[in-house]
């Protein structure tokens, strides 16, 4: 064997033992002819000392990230020279011999000094990701991810779930984003699609009688690279038969609780639930951050008779910034720029003086009665600032929801180590297709309505009879789990009856012919005794990034893409050669379906 011990596991109890270590030169220091090296392996660092004149002379040539094999005797460090920051800080290894297993070229950035990480551009870090991952904080992120995988599997295995892999080459079916397409060389002009989720296959597994399925699944979505998204990502995918919403939520809480124990945090269960309508009304978001107690107050009725033109709108709402009246004018102007960057015209405000008097542009334009009652209506105290949004309900609530988050940051209301979880239930089943496209999503079908979650979500039982006649009122049998303002998982009770699924497609403008072409296999399966079933999928990259305290999911993915979907390490995506293009049949016209099927049958017969 190349080594007898691991660097980070040596302790005082090992004193006097002869050991052989392997690892990288983390740091080298010369002191009067004696050379000290911090030798790093996956477990940590051990200080190795080259005192012997022969080995010390050779050690002068060692540089950062050289790969070494050293043999020596473990000794307790002299009094006063211990390093409390290292697990092995009470000992050092006096080297008797060593071997250079490999040298290192000059580094593009320093690895041993973690404080320099912020000075290194992300493109450089990703281009040399194999070096970036030598830094303990990055390596530990991947180990945390592995531990989270294990914790989830332990919970699911204890409930008799079966881990099953579903295809990653399938047909293109509309699911809410654009597909990544893969040319099928043996069928020129035709394409596979990489799955956006295992949704349809996991439902088919329920029809197959597997009852309890899970998978740590790779998923692919060809979408614009908005904030902190990846074209390929991982989700913990779970599906089970003969369950209702409460069953799935209970299992989801057990999984999340076990995973959060990895960082020493005990989640109180059951996790509170909040309706989608309440979340939007109180927090302006369907993924509210509940670590701070700032709520939106609706003022539409309060200003119903106002003479102020700005407040003569579909919706008027407000949030209060405690102590905000003391903000200087430049800060209040900055709020206006902040709002404009979010597509609003501005952020109206009233300042409540310490004497209770109101000031600011809005205060001058509202009636005496409105001035007398507005502070009490929104719960503002002397010294506070009241911010308003007015306009259509959706965009106004979104602006106020963002404002409450910005207020929390400015007032330092979010404390490190705080966690707030909630379930969001009773979301709308459908939304206007125009709203979906405006937010950057793909509106499925050819109707003015599209699914909020996906086309396979069941309506709540009370809407089963009329969701297609009143799609705007129908609520979905769906549930999302939110942590600190991040949606970390979502699921639903699924449709398991063919006629209901066809009615949903019809609402979305998916014709019977199109449904049979793209989803015929699912509709056919529903005809053979499909059980009631439901499930949930957790965004695994997001969960691990939250656990590790990372700002970006890229930090918890071994080889992530940059913000533009580029891999700086391999320079993917890349052009292909004309020969590859020809072989892949990218430009070929697909044969008529009947002809292609006949050829396939002929080939199959020939093989037999």
Swiss-Prot record:
CDD domains tied to this protein: AspRS_core, EcAspRS_like_N
Record-listed L-aspartate binding positions: 175, 221, 453, 494
Gene Ontology CC annotations of this record: cytoplasm
Pfam families cross-referenced by the UniProt entry: GAD, tRNA-synt_2, tRNA_anti-codon
Annotated segments matching region Disordered: 566-608
EC number: 6.1.1.23
Site-annotated residues for Important for tRNA non-discrimination: 31, 80
Gene3D superfamilies from the UniProt entry: Bira Bifunctional Protein, Domain 2, GAD-like domain, Nucleic acid-binding proteins
Keyword Ribonucleoprotein belongs to the record: no
Region called Aspartate, residue ranges: 199-202
GO molecular function (one): ATP binding
Composition bias type Basic and acidic residues, residue spans: 580-596
Catalytic activity: tRNA(Asx) + L-aspartate + ATP = L-aspartyl-tRNA(Asx) + AMP + diphosphate
Record flagged with keyword Chaperone: no
Subcellular compartments: Cytoplasm
Record key words, sorted: Aminoacyl-tRNA synthetase, ATP-binding, Cytoplasm, Ligase, Nucleotide-binding, Protein biosynthesis
HAMAP family, sorted: Asp_tRNA_synth_type1
Described purpose of this protein according to its UniProt entry: Aspartyl-tRNA synthetase with relaxed tRNA specificity since it is able to aspartylate not only its cognate tRNA(Asp) but also tRNA(Asn). Reaction proceeds in two steps: L-aspartate is first activated by ATP to form Asp-AMP and then transferred to the acceptor end of tRNA(Asp/Asn).
Quaternary structure, from the entry: Homodimer.
PANTHER family on file: ASPARTATE--TRNA LIGASE, MITOCHONDRIAL, ASPARTYL/LYSYL-TRNA SYNTHETASE
Protein name: Aspartate--tRNA(Asp/Asn) ligase
Organism (species): Corynebacterium glutamicum (strain ATCC 13032 / DSM 20300 / JCM 1318 / BCRC 11384 / CCUG 27702 / LMG 3730 / NBRC 12168 / NCIMB 10025 / NRRL B-2784 / 534)
Lineage summary: Bacteria, Bacillati, Actinomycetota, Actinomycetes, Mycobacteriales
